[in-house]
Amino acid sequence: VAGLDTSAVSLPTVSIPALPSLTLSETEVATMNALIAQATFERLELLSTQVYYLAQQEITNLKIAIPDELADKLRTLVGWAAIAVDPYVERLSVEGFRLPGETDVNQDLADLWDGNRLAAEQSLAFTDALSMRRAYWTVGSGDSPGDLPRICVESPLNMAVRWNLRGDMARDALRWFEVDGRPHIMLETLTQSTHMARNDQGAWEVVDRDVHNFGFVPVVRMANNPLTMARGGRSEITPALISIIDSACRRLLGLEVASELYSAPQKLILGATEADFQDSAGATKSAWTTYITSLLALERDEDGNVPEVHQFQVYDPAVFTKVIEMYASQAAGILAAVPQDLGLYTDGNPTSADSWDAMETRRNRKAIRKQAIFGSALVEVMQMAQRFLNGGRLPEQFKRMAVDWMPPSMPSLAQTADPVTKLIAAGALPARSDVTLKR
């Protein structure tokens, strides 16, 4: 694209070379330049926590006790970062959307949700938001007239968005992806969506323009734990947790090296002769053969003295495992997890049922808070889809809606049957409805 500066971009699936194209305006080129620069800056921040969630991080070797030659050949990892994300993804599940005054899920919105297979896609958005601060939802026209709008979950690694001064509405957005190995770009503005692909000559050409003139960019940000100074959200993999994980991995590396060097007890031999270390042919035995076999019996010397064999204290792995357990306990406090979640099992004093329930309650409360934050983004997504169905206009009945979430806790059938039966008997719940069945 003429004038498009992409020299600093490093993306895993697509590069954007500065090649001529007569189909883009100067404004579009300037917009793409700004979005690409923003993507380059944000990508490093997003990956800094994502690599820990995937257990692909590189641990810095302090080079004090372990040389680089050993550290480069060994890799030690713990899966604690995933525990900061996965338990909440398991607790977040959308069952549908309700309009004011309705007790059952709205069927029009359910058709939109099911038609885009979002029951399966929603967990992708929750995982990205919890691990990388945010996820994106995009809305577009259907493949042909009369089709449902397309609703997609997009990784923040493949999106760049600029926002208004309040930080709640997108001004423009850029998305990149590959189809059959061919790079594609989607540029979203207030008036249109421009789809570009790289041709066989390496030049970018416009594949399609969807001129909707809706006055909004069909992109919604689902931010995790946003702040007034960080509307883009914060990862559940916090700097404190990352520090503990790095320290634990270094201790595991030390344990691995020490087990190789000191698992066989070291010995000291006094008074042995050279012949004790030779085979029947007079050749010197290897150190391993000598250590394993020859020290089982040593002959007296010519003066009748027996060589002395001393053994140093055997290596104790508890030197490292106790430290690792201490790090696991610290991580459990940050994660609101019971020790068993981090692999700590104490047979003599196991976690009590009350302690377990307290941790589960804390996680459930946190999941409910995330339902409120993520639910606001999901409502905006469904409202955008309704705009696409109604020529950019949002019907009055869809201006207010609520998300129906599956309860984060999973009580047994016996625990729920009694209170629901009493509510039905009191007339607080209808005997047959989606709400009653859900409970």
Predicted regions and their residues:
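C-terminal structural cap/anchor segments
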Residues: 330, 334-399
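Charged substrate- and nucleic-acid-binding regions of tRNA-handling and nucleotidyl-transfer enzymes
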Residues: 414-439
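Short coil/turn segments at secondary-structure boundaries
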Residues: 124-126, 140-142, 259-268, 341-347, ...
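Extended amphipathic alpha-helical segments with heptad-repeat/coiled-coil character used for oligomerization
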Residues: 389-420
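Extended, helix-rich architectural segments
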Residues: 1-153, 158
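Generic structural marker for isolated residues within well-ordered, non-membrane alpha-helices
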Residues: 109, 328, 382, 433-437
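Extended, charged amphipathic alpha-helical segments
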Residues: 207-359, 406, 412-413
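Extended, regular secondary-structure scaffolds
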Residues: 130-131, 136-239
